[in-house]
């Protein structure tokens, strides 16, 4: 019998801005840890709901929360803390995590969201249990010393039809503790092209985290 899942949505206040979120939780028992899902420029938290990722994570025992980034989705009215393509202060995602009371989450970060996740990942004292970059932008804006200082285990994901995935991997492979999932025949949003492979790879990675 499939485990029950509770789903809800709402808004949080982050640095004076209202941000929309969707959440899925295990219907019973304590969640193992939290997973924060970010998104690309043409997407939103709805992507993760429609794909079934929120549901699959909650079924597997995780608290899964997807936010709509500032200026996008249902957070359209919120002003972004940095122009698109520039690194946002790491304090922005730290404030999101605090507002949602996530504890240190695993962060899933496709495409545009790299401008938020990479400064958060590499901030001094950052202790994320896991990081799943999916061809994120801004990988060239983090220096080698900052990559080398990251203790967080990473699952680097990209489609082999995505030139940006290969480019970002050239930088992300400097993360000391990483493994790679390359999806054959998949493009930039590789999780949409190969949802089963995405979910299997993601859940397998999470299972191995402490």
From Swiss-Prot:
The modification Phosphoserine is found at residue 91. It comes from the Eukaryota. SUPFAM superfamilies: alpha/beta-Hydrolases. One of its GO terms (biological process) is positive regulation of transcription by RNA polymerase II. Its main location: cytoplasm. It is an enzyme of class 2 (transferase). Ubiquitous. Detected in spleen, thymus, prostate, testis, ovary, small intestine, colon, peripheral blood leukocyte, heart, placenta, lung, liver, skeletal muscle, pancreas and kidney. One of its GO terms (molecular function) is protein-lysine-acetyltransferase activity. It catalyses: L-lysyl-[protein] + acetyl-CoA = N(6)-acetyl-L-lysyl-[protein] + CoA + H(+). Its EC number is 2.3.1.-. Belongs to the AB hydrolase superfamily. ABHD14 family. Acts as an atypical protein-lysine deacetylase in vitro. Catalyzes the deacetylation of lysine residues using CoA as substrate, generating acetyl-CoA and the free amine of protein-lysine residues. Additional experiments are however required to confirm the protein-lysine deacetylase activity in vivo. Has hydrolase activity towards various surrogate p-nitrophenyl (pNp) substrates, such as pNp-butyrate, pNp-acetate and pNp-octanoate in vitro, with a strong preference for pNp-acetate. May activate transcription. May interact with TAF1. This is Putative protein-lysine deacylase ABHD14B. The lineage of its organism: Eukaryota, Metazoa, Chordata, Craniata, Vertebrata. The gene is ABHD14B.
């Amino acid at each position: 019998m499939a485990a029950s899942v509770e789903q809800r949505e709402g808004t949080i206040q982050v640095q004076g801005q209202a941000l929309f979120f969707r959440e899925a939780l295990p219907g019973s028992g304590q969640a193992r840890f939290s997973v924060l899902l970010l998104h690309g420029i043409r997407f939103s938290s709805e992507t993760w709901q429609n794909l079934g990722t929120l549901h699959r994570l909650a079924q597997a025992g995780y608290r899964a929360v997807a936010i709509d980034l500032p200026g996008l989705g249902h957070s359209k009215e919120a002003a972004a803390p940095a122009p698109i393509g520039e690194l946002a202060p790491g304090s922005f995602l730290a404030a999101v995590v605090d507002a949602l009371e996530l504890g240190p989450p695993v962060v899933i970060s496709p495409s545009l969201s790299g401008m938020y996740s990479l400064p958060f990942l590499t901030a001094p004292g950052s202790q994320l249990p896991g990081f799943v970059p999916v061809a994120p932008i801004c990988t060239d804006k983090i220096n080698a010393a900052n990559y080398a200082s990251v203790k967080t285990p990473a699952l680097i994901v990209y489609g082999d039809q995505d030139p940006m995935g290969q480019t970002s991997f050239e930088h992300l492979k400097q993360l000391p503790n990483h493994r790679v999932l390359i999806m054959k025949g998949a493009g930039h949003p590789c999780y949409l092209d190969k949802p089963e492979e995405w979910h299997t790879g993601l859940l397998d990675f999470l299972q191995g985290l402490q």
